[in-house]
Amino acid sequence: MSEGIYKSPKKSPYSCEIYDSEFEREFMEELEKDPKVKKWTKNHGIRIPYVNIGSKVAHYNPDFIVEYEDGTQELIEIKGKNNLTEIIKRKQKAAKEWCEKRNIKYRLITL
């Protein structure tokens, strides 16, 4: 994992954004270049409850919230193809349900 700080993003409300992987850093660059993207952040404070494998309620913090120029919003998770575990599937299911209730799109990007 390659963690780091993305400095001075123009479309984020913050002066820097923390990334947890090289995939996330590359995605931040794509968001900055995309003319359809109005704003984005990883520092959104969204915590989605889900039931983990031990049948206990846990909380999932999605990677990105993106707002587009047309007003739509999208919650985005970035994962490597080898990371699609049962836990990720449970988080994805909970995120989709959470987003549907709020008229937000959900997308899992696998690299």
Where are these regions (language model features)?
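Electrostatic, structured charged patches in enzyme active sites and in nucleic-acid/phosphate-binding
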Residues: M1-L111
